Amino acid sequence: MKTYKIAVDGPAASGKSSTSDLVARKLGFSHLISGNLYRAVTYGLVRRFGEVRPGDEEQKRFVLELSIEVRNNRVFLDGEDVSESLRKEVVDRHVVSVAREKYIREKVFTIQRSVIDLEKRGIVVDGRDIATRIMPNADLKVFLTASPETRARRRYMEGGSESYEELLESIKKRDHNDRTREHDPLVATCDSIVIENDSMTLEETADEIIRLFRRVESFN
């Protein structure tokens, strides 16, 4: 039986993870949130050292020896489930600099590939370099996007201490960092289908991806 692969890329707050989760549940596929792996590394570094020091050899050794496992989208560091700690503010603050490090990207790549290769039925993987690097052979490649203003409003509606203006500035800065980073920058591939979901609900976005997938599936 063929194992179907759906790649979902996009900038911050574009709805990648929520949409991918809904698509996976509707199709009966597995779902891998790539961002959680970078968050797990970040959390491990902050918990061990109190800060993230890019290029630090001691921290590099720590990361390379760190055991990271994914089970049903729960993330385990050295056997401990740290899933509930991945959205802490301190992780938010440092994850961008962590994701820039080439050796960390290589470690995460290895974990992603091991999860994907073990899947038998189908998998939806979301992130920022899925179609370009992680699953260049995906059956369907989707690039989700929306204006920075729309994405800032979504984040603002989730609650939290930051104002809309602060969130908008943060998203614009993250977009710039993602698109200009040296290793695996955020970009829509020539064969990715771009979905601008400013005026679409989560359900509508998921249904559109499923419609596109059914079209691909019909040719296999």
UniProtKB/Swiss-Prot annotation:
| Cited CDD domains | CMPK (cd02020)
**Which residues bind ATP per the record?**
G10, P11, A12, A13, S14, G15, K16, S17, S18
Give EC number(s), comma-separated.
2.7.4.25
Q: Could you tell me the keywords of this UniProt record? A: ATP-binding, Kinase, Nucleotide-binding, Transferase
Q: Which domain of life is it from?
A: Eukaryota
Q: What class of enzyme is it?
A: transferase
Q: Which Pfam family would be a valid example here?
A: Cytidylate_kin
Coiled-coil annotation: which residues?
Answer: none
**Gene3D superfamilies (alphabetical):** P-loop containing nucleotide triphosphate hydrolases
GO molecular function of the protein, one example?
A: CMP kinase activity
Q: Which SUPFAM superfamilies match?
A: P-loop containing nucleoside triphosphate hydrolases
Recorded hits in InterPro entries, A to Z, give: Cytidylate_kin, Cytidylate_kinase_dom, P-loop_NTPase
Please write the reaction equations for the catalytic activity of this protein: CMP + ATP = CDP + ADP; dCMP + ATP = dCDP + ADP
> What is the similarity comment for this entry?
Belongs to the cytidylate kinase family. Type 1 subfamily.
* NCBIfam families reported for this sequence: cmk (TIGR00017)
Q: What is this protein called?
A: Probable cytidylate kinase
Species of origin: Encephalitozoon cuniculi (strain GB-M1)
